[in-house]
Swiss-Prot record:
It is found in: Secreted. Probable neurotoxin. It comes from Californiconus californicus (California cone). Residues 1-22 form the signal peptide. This is Conotoxin Cal6.30. Keywords: Disulfide bond, Knottin, Neurotoxin, Secreted, Signal, Toxin. The keyword Metal-binding does not apply. The cysteine framework is VI/VII (C-C-CC-C-C). The presence of a 'disulfide through disulfide knot' structurally defines this protein as a knottin. One of its GO terms (cellular component) is extracellular region. Disulfide bonds join 31-47, 38-51, 46-55. It comes from the Eukaryota.
Length: 60
């Protein structure tokens, strides 16, 4: 039973990781929430943490 739980948890973590990285392209990531790319403009690093919050907070 413990093995099944561990395996299920591992698959869940890997799946979440794949979804999180789905929009990455050559180190650049598109943030759907903020509608901008990060990794191109140094002042628009909006994808670390909550990208929408940081874009709004930084006034970008």
């Amino acid at each position: 039973m413990k093995v099944t739980c561990v395996l299920t948890l591992a698959v869940l973590i890997l799946t979440i990781g794949q979804i999180a990285n789905a929009d990455s392209t050559l180190g650049q990531r598109y943030c759907k929430a903020s509608g901008s790319w990060c990794g191109i403009h140094k002042h628009r690093e909006c994808c670390s943490g909550n990208c929408f919050f940081w874009c709004v907070y930084n006034g970008k």
